[in-house]
């Protein structure tokens, strides 16, 4: 019975004692972590509107994930090598799930979302205070004492999102450094690029599901089930619309916890891929005995930490890699974190539509590119020198084509008092006193309220009152306003709720932009895999996990944390009109100067990426002049293969020779 149980246990362990099974589990972890991260990025505008906070704070929330990573990355990368790496990864996935759950809590702890409006949900002529009426002062619906602003439940609820994102970052910490080093240690060197390509593909599959989930959640009203959506006076294209962001985070929490389970069944070490089973046993025994040596002394692990830390930090080969990646990640963090906001404001689309289009055009192209790049590196056994040169050329080509984005633009929606005068003349700046004109001074309108209507003349107005409208017909989003004194048109001088559409020409430009973006995504993914392999080969095998950790540390300190914060502050400077909360305090931005937004958004990304190619060129030179620690030249490879063949033939002879009666003699011979 004991032998049967031992055999069953061995068989069970054997199912998980394979590098490809671990690769599959790690790919799922990459999918889950990128699913959560992409969904978070896609919901930034929803969080901004839900809590009425500026973009700078939203950028801080986005960067808080990197803060969580930063707290543990180096220690996990080093001490994780001494511990059971798969189990540490499993715990990390579970912690990510906890973080996602905490992010969703504010929805259950605060009241319903009340957007800024003076319009009642039903057309009641006795209560049409939102229309142009002489000798009557408008108020937001409902009104509160401004002193109550700080007491609003939602005023600090965004801190839950901040803390949850930090915890999510802590949980994500061990996945990349420990997972990649685990694969690098036990995979064939020629298979490593393909495996890394599969991981990177998993990292792109996650965003596909994340964007689809984000698109679905953004199309559902945040308080669905507790409000009658027919009474809403806003649509998904309205900048005040908030989608059901909390649903997606609950889904992400469940996925992360489920993905964590398989990692608790993997062994601490795996057989080296490509070696015979008997040789594997010998090598693994050596590895295990080596790993157990430091445990003879309690302080053995911590004693060597700081001396060990110096090696990758002071390694000359990595000096050019760090600034290159920091500049690149700054640019990409800015570009992808604020891409939904840019497309919404530039092309006048809803969050749900923008997120869906991003997933359709960009991510499949990146996935295909990752797989092809990994396969080509394995197929042609591309050297480190060639990989560095190839990555440099492809990345530079993608960067050059990216300047076409500056040409595919749309103008601001014309809004009287903001971008245009009431006579339709364009104005360079927004001045608060310009929102009033001779046609609406008698109406006693609120000048800060954002209840936009689109007139028959193609000009939008900040509210029906500011358009001089005196009558309304219909309910909800079907409400129509008549007798509008500020609307000069040959027709009925009427207006409908919402901003004016940007027209089919702008929609066509969005299609051109997305096609260009898909093409650039393919070039980017072709360059990413060889570039990442150059980085891995710059690190000694025994320092790989710590080297990856230090690299991630540098990226988080100088790119992941500051980029969304400083760029969010720059975006706030392009705001033309800030929203107003119930109590009168400023809320989220309602309209941006899209021309300034475009120059900052595209210009900052281009400047950061352009400056990154100087250290990239240095990397190409270094790989040609110096022998990298992770590189194996052809002669060494031939000698290793000859030794392996000789050992395998000895192993075969030993099995055929009857004079070896036990395993001890067999191991002695080997």
From Swiss-Prot:
Topological domain, Cytoplasmic: which ranges?
Answer: 1-20, 81-86, 185-203, 268-311, 378-381, 537-545, 624-670
* Pfam entry (one): Kazal_2
Entry keyword set:
Cell membrane, Disulfide bond, Glycoprotein, Ion transport, Membrane, Transmembrane, Transmembrane helix, Transport
- Lineage, top-rank taxon, reads Eukaryota
Q: Which InterPro entries match?
A: Kazal_dom (IPR002350), Kazal_dom_sf (IPR036058), MFS_trans_sf (IPR036259), OATP (IPR004156)
**Function field:** Mediates the Na(+)-independent transport of organic anions such as methotrexate, taurocholate, folate and prostaglandin E2. May contribute to renal secretion and/or reabsorption of hydrophobic anionic compounds. Mediates renal clearance of methotrexate from the blood.
NCBIfam families per UniProt = oat
Recorded family membership: Belongs to the organo anion transporter (TC 2.A.60) family.
Q: What is this protein called?
A: Solute carrier organic anion transporter family member 1A3
Gene that this polypeptide is encoded by: Slco1a3
């Amino acid at each position: 019975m004991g032998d049967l149980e031992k055999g069953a246990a061995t068989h069970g362990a054997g199912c998980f004692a394979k590098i490809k099974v671990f690769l599959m589990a790690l790919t799922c972890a990459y999918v889950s972590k990128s699913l959560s991260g992409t969904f978070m990025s896609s919901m930034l505008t929803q969080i901004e509107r839900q809590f009425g906070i500026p973009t700078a704070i939203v950028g801080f929330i986005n960067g808080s994930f990197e803060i969580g990573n930063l707290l543990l990355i180096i220690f996990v990368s080093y001490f994780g090598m001494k511990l059971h790496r798969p189990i540490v990864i499993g715990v990390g996935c579970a912690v990510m799930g906890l973080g996602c759950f905490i992010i969703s809590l504010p929805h259950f702890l605060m009241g319903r979302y009340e957007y800024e409006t003076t319009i009642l949900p039903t057309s009641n002529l006795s209560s049409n205070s939102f229309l142009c009426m002489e000798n009557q002062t408008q108020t937001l619906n409902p009104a509160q004492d401004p002193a109550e602003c700080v007491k609003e439940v939602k005023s600090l609820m965004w801190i839950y999102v901040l803390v949850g994102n930090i915890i999510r970052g802590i949980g994500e910490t061990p996945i990349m450094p420990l997972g990649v080093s685990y694969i690098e240690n036990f995979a064939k060197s020629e298979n490593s690029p393909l495996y890394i390509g599969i991981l990177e593909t998993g990292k792109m599959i996650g965003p596909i599901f994340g964007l689809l989930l984000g698109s679905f959640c953004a199309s559902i009203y945040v308080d669905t089930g507790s409000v009658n959506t027919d009474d809403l006076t806003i649509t998904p294209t309205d900048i005040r619309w908030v989608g059901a962001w909390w649903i997606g985070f609950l889904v992400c929490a469940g996925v992360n916890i489920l993905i964590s389970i398989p990692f608790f069944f993997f062994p601490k070490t795996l057989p080296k891929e490509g070696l015979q089973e008997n040789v594997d046993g010998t090598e693994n025994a050596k590895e295990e005995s080596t790993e157990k040596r430091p445990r003879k002394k309690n302080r053995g692990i911590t004693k060597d930490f700081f001396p060990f830390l110096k090696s990758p930090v002071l390694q000359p080969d990595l000096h050019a890699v760090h600034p290159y990646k920091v500049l690149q990640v700054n640019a990409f963090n800015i570009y992808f974190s604020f891409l939904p906001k840019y497309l919404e404001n530039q092309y006048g689309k809803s969050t749900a539509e923008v997120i869906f289009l991003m997933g359709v055009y960009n991510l499949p192209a990146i996935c295909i590119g990752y797989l092809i790049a990994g396969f080509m590196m394995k197929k042609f056994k591309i050297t480190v020198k060639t990989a560095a040169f190839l990555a440099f050329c492809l990345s530079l080509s993608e960067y050059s084509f990216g300047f076409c984005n500056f040409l595919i633009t749309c103008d601001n929606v014309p809004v009287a008092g903001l971008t245009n005068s009431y006579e339709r003349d364009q104005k360079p700046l927004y001045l608060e006193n310009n929102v009033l004109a001779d046609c609406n001074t008698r109406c006693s309108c609120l000048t800060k309220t954002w209840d936009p209507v689109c007139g028959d003349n193609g000009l939008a107005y900040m509210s029906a009152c500011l358009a001089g409208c005196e009558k309304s017909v219909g309910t909800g989003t079907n409400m129509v306003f008549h007798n509008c004194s500020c609307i000069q048109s040959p027709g009925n001088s009427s207006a409908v709720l919402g901003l004016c559409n940007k027209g089919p020409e702008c929609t066509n430009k969005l299609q051109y932009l997305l096609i260009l973006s898909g093409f650039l995504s393919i070039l980017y993914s072709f360059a990413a895999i060889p570039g990442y392999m150059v980085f891995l080969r710059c690190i000694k095998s025994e320092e790989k996990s710590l080297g990856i950790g230090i690299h991630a540390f540098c990226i988080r300190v100088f790119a992941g944390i500051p980029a969304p914060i400083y760029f969010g502050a720059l975006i706030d400077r392009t705001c033309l009109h800030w929203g107003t909360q119930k109590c009168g305090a400023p809320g989220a931005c309602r309209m941006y100067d899209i021309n300034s937004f475009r120059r900052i958004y595209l210009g900052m990304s281009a400047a950061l990426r352009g400056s990154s190619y100087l250290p990239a060129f240095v990397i190409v030179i270094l790989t040609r002049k110096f022998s990298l620690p992770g590189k194996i030249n052809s002669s060494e490879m031939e000698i290793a293969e000859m030794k392996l063949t000789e050992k395998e033939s000895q192993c075969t002879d030993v099995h055929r020779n009857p004079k070896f009666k036990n395993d001890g003699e067999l191991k002695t011979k080997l």
